[in-house]
Amino acid sequence: MASIRRTLSFSERHQKLVDINYCKKLHVEALQRLQNQTRDQMVQNENDDRAERKRFLRLLQDEQFELDMEEAIQKAEENKRLRELQLAQEEKLATELAKLKRESLKDEKLRQQVRENSAELRELEKKLKAAYMNKERAAQIAEKDAIKYGQMKRDAEIARTMMEEHERLIKEESAAEDKRNQAKAQYSHDLEKQLEEQGKKKQEAYEQLLKEKLMIDEIVRKIYEEDQLERQQRLEKMNTTRRYIEEFQKEQALWRKKKREEMEEENRKIIEFAKLQQQREEDRMAKVQEKVKKKRLQLKNMLTQRLEEMLRQREDLEQVRQELYQEEQAEIYKKKLEEEAEEKLRKQKELKQDFMDQMALKELILQAAKEEEETFRKAMLAKFAEDDRIELMNAQKPRMKQLEHKRAVEKLIEERRNQFLADKQRELEEWQWQQRRQGCINAIVEEERLKLLKEHATKLLGYLPKGVFKNEDDIDMLGEEFRKAYQKRSEICEK
């Protein structure tokens, strides 16, 4: 029994061990199942999370799409609003441009009417046209003066050419005279040379004579030596020969002296002739130079006189033209002043007459209005009284009706008075509008006047008549350079 228990115990232990192992196995399986479940749950959770994320992303995408669509719709509406605003602005701008264009055309038409109807602008245009005519006339006069000056210049050039030709002829004559003088000098030189040669020949003849004398002396000596014995006999002959020789020597000396005197006289005559010729030539050249100087001075005086005469004629013509122009401008200015004074007096009379007529008309209108009001009041009162008399029978009601009628009449009179005042106010506003329009016209006239001055005054400096500039501001408006030139021109005209 004990062994059985022990066996059982062993079996139990074994069973227990098996149970334990089985339990462990079950526990492991349970753990595996739990792990599988956990893993499946995690996978499921992951799938759910993934689906949730996808759903959330889809929701976000849907919301983003809705936001994008809403933003696109807003942008489209904003673009539509901007396009409508732009179209409205463009339409407004086009309207403004059309309005400005209409106003510009209206202003241009008004300016055209003012230019056509303004007496001041017409007068200024007449003055500018007159200034252009004066400028053209001055240009023609300057052209004529230039032609005259060119003719004078050509005459002076011809005179200068004639003088140069005359001087050239004088130089040629002087050169020819110099050649003649040189020929004369050469002739004198040749003559002196011939005289010198003659003197040499005479000297040679004298030397030959001396040689002959020496030969004679030698012959005499030889004769004396050879025939000393015959000296006594030949003494006379020798004395005669000596006397002959002495006479010959005397004659030779006299002939030499005479020849020398003749040569000196001839040289003196030649020198005197040369001096005389030189003096004559100097006198002739002096006379020629004096004649040339006289002709040159005469021509110069003639040209100077012609220039002075032409300048004097030009100055006289310019002075006459200036005097005529000044007289004409003075007459025009005087006539203009008279016309302006007459126009001013006429306008004053017209304004005074208009004022008196307006006052009289106003009195008549007021009187007529009062009379009409009184007549109307009486007529209405009579009408209302007649109506009330017919309609009403008791004494209290006519009194009340009379008061009502009086108030009605006064109301009608007040309405008529208000209508009258409204008409007068409208007339006043119309008069003020006319005044503003006249002021605008005056401003346009002034602008057009200044525009004409800016366009033409600088081109017509020196030719503008009096009265073109109203005051110094018109001159200053054209610039400092124009003002200085105009003042300088005015000072020259005053001088």
UniProtKB/Swiss-Prot annotation:
Residues 1-315 are annotated as: Interaction with BBOF1. Its main location: nucleus. Belongs to the MNS1 family. It comes from Bos taurus (Bovine). Residues 172-199 are annotated as: Disordered. This is Meiosis-specific nuclear structural protein 1. InterPro entries: MNS1 (IPR026504), TPH_dom (IPR043597). Keywords: Cell projection, Cilium, Coiled coil, Cytoplasm, Cytoskeleton, Flagellum, Meiosis, Nucleus. Expressed in trachea multiciliated cells. The lineage of its organism: Eukaryota, Metazoa, Chordata, Craniata, Vertebrata. It is found in: Nucleus; Cytoplasm, Cytoskeleton, Cilium axoneme; Cytoplasm, Cytoskeleton, Flagellum axoneme.
